[in-house]
UniProtKB/Swiss-Prot annotation:
This is ATP-dependent Clp protease ATP-binding subunit ClpX. It comes from Bordetella petrii (strain ATCC BAA-461 / DSM 12804 / CCUG 43448). The gene is clpX. GO terms for biological process: cell division; proteolysis involved in protein catabolic process. Residues 3-56 form the ClpX-type ZB domain. ATP binds at residues 121-128.
Length: 432
């Protein structure tokens, strides 16, 4: 009898870590000469999870650039616009800091999202700012045109197509897509057409604003897999937009009149500063924009409330356009010089030509966006002939080529090898 009792006691197994018997725990898992209970497994999982979260937080902290570093990077590609760049840098830094904060469980303080609105004239750098931010942060980026959007059920793109395009850019990696930056251009073009209700439905104006509302605030969007059409009884890809940073931009033509009317009404009396309307530029007026101005312009109050960071961009003057032509890392002049270098020729753009290009862009009122077309037109014939000539060592672009539609001066590598002396002198005369 004692032998049987002893053998029974010997069969009771214990956890090798906490020493609890198999009767004290729910499950005991055996290994080579060791045992572990379910309680110890849960404890180990908690330890590993906490360490993984700490490592992830440290990685995000080390990868996330400071606002000053973000602005310094933007300075390399975007000329001027100091205040908008500072505002963007702080907003983007706080946004990704908010995402990191959300990963810490147990914190009672919930940080809300600060989406961004960029207001500025055509060609002032709104799109470039958003693209440069995404490139620096190494996050997915997608750009949408608000003018192509319509309410769901009508001909055109609905707002969920933006998320579908984002997923395509991320190869359908949902986790990656949920930390992206989405830039919606021409947001001013979907303003309410009229303050008065109409019997006809505004499917591309206020209707689109209402559709964008939940997307910008944060919702779970259902997107068809692999870009297919929506139909019943199919599985959808679920994308949470809570941590997606939305940047919207627009030229807002006519907003300056709304701001001017408001500010001039308040500037009445003996202490009011009297200034002619022509003295105040569009950029200066935009800097005084208030939410009520945007609502009067035609944006619905709910949408304005979900875009708390409003950055206004200045008009670009001649000096700024000359800087844009030469100073950024990927400036237009450097790009064309690279193209000519591939043909074995040096492109020499004189300072007078740079100013003439800037003046022509200002006259066309296209901002920085119109610079490329001016240079392309001036160099078209040269770029057409250069590959077949092969012995041109230098191309000189001066002021007369831009202002008088002349031809650039071609300098050949070998005077004796020049195909036609009179033709060369004619080219020189045209550029002189």
């Amino acid at each position: 009898m004692p032998d049987k009792k002893g053998s029974a006691d010997a069969k009771v197994l214990h956890c090798s870590f906490c020493n609890k018997s198999q009767h004290e725990v729910r499950k005991l898992i055996a290994g080579p000469s060791v045992f572990i209970c379910d309680e110890c497994i849960d404890l180990c999982n908690d330890i590993i999870r906490e360490e993984a979260q700490a490592t992830a937080r440290a990685a995000i902290r080390s990868e996330l650039p400071t606002p000053s570093e973000i602005k310094t990077f933007l300075d390399q590609y975007v000329i001027g616009q100091t205040l908008p760049k500072r505002m963007l840098a702080v907003a983007v830094y706080n946004h990704y800091k908010r995402i990191r904060h959300g990963e810490i469980k147990g914190d009672e303080v919930e940080l809300s999202k600060s989406n961004i609105m960029l207001i500025g004239p055509t060609g002032s750098g709104k799109t470039l700012l958003a693209q440069t931010l995404a490139r620096m942060l190494n996050v997915p980026f997608v750009m949408a045109d608000a003018t192509t959007l319509t309410e769901a059920g009508y001909v055109g793109e609905d707002v969920e197509n933006i998320i579908q395009k984002l997923l395509q850019n991320c190869n359908y990696e949902v986790e990656k897509a949920q930390r992206a930056i989405i830039y919606i251009d021409e947001i001013d073009k979907i303003s309410r057409k009229s303050d008065n209700p109409s019997i006809t439905r505004d499917v591309s104006g206020e209707g689109v604003q209402q559709a964008l509302l939940k997307l910008i605030e944060g919702t779970v969007a259902s997107v068809p897999p692999q870009g297919g059409r929506k139909h019943p009884n199919q599985d959808f890809v679920q994308v949470d937009t809570t941590n997606i940073l939305f940047i919207v931009g627009g030229a807002f033509d006519g907003l300056e009149k709304v701001i001017r009317d408001r500010t001039e009404k308040s500037g009445i009396g003996f202490s009011a500063s009297v200034r002619a309307k022509s003295e105040r530029g569009v950029g200066e007026l935009f800097s005084e924009v208030e939410p009520e101005d945007l609502i009067k312009f035609g944006l619905i109050p709910e949408l304005v409330g979900r875009l708390p960071v409003v950055a206004t961009l200045d008009e670009l003057d001649e000096a700024a356009l000359v800087q844009i032509l030469t100073e950024p890392k990927n400036s237009l002049i450097k790009q064309f010089q690279k193209l000519f270098a591939m043909e074995g020729a040096e492109l020499d753009v004189r300072p007078g030509a740079l100013k003439a290009i800037a003046r022509k862009a200002l006259k066309r009122k296209t901002g920085a966006r119109g610079l490329r077309s001016i240079i392309e037109a001036a160099l078209l014939d040269t770029m057409y002939d250069l590959p077949s000539q092969g012995n041109v060592s230098r191309v000189v672009l001066d002021e007369n080529v831009i202002d008088s539609d002349g031809k650039p001066l071609l300098i050949y590598a070998d005077e004796a090898a020049a195909p036609d002396k009179p033709a060369r002198s004619q080219v020189r005369g045209a550029a002189a």
